[in-house]
């Protein structure tokens, strides 16, 4: 784990280091901590209503690599979700050791957020994901989410699990809409609904989870 700048974020560092993780998961924890970077300098706050440009900047910050080759999408999406919650660029991820092996989302959640995030019931299409997110925004004003997809189709690799993010954008005098963010990618970081649909067959398995303010 790399810490840059002053000691102004010692509370974050100590919280991450003090997580009570099962000893059986110690190797996974080491992989996560080795890849995780924490910015200790005071950062400029992003606005409450995030724009597409804000999200693109935040996603690029999170992917802290020169040459990205790692299966660290779970960590990237958790870092971005954490940063969006705090409206600051705080956490980022380098490539993970054993780059072809993904990370356990439950362990990542415990390290980043202090507990495993509650997961939605299974959604069968990206359209259902969009509907679920907008519904949760209407009811609770939740606006930032992590999406776990079980049937993501990646070039060369084929079908695999993949985590990415979604945020509800509220532009002035316009209807709120869902913007997907894939910080694992180095191009087209903000795919449209139609573009992201191309990575899935007609049916799939999707789960939505989000950080609960009361656990902060």
Swiss-Prot record:
Record-linked InterPro entries: Sal_SpvD (IPR008834)
Keyword Nucleus: no
Keywords: Plasmid, Virulence
Pfam families, per the entry: SpvD
Keyword DNA damage: no
Superkingdom, taxonomy of origin: Bacteria
Function: Not known. This protein is involved in the virulence of salmonellas.
Family: Belongs to the SpvD family.
Name of the featured protein: Virulence protein vsdE
Lineage of the organism: Bacteria, Pseudomonadati, Pseudomonadota, Gammaproteobacteria, Enterobacterales
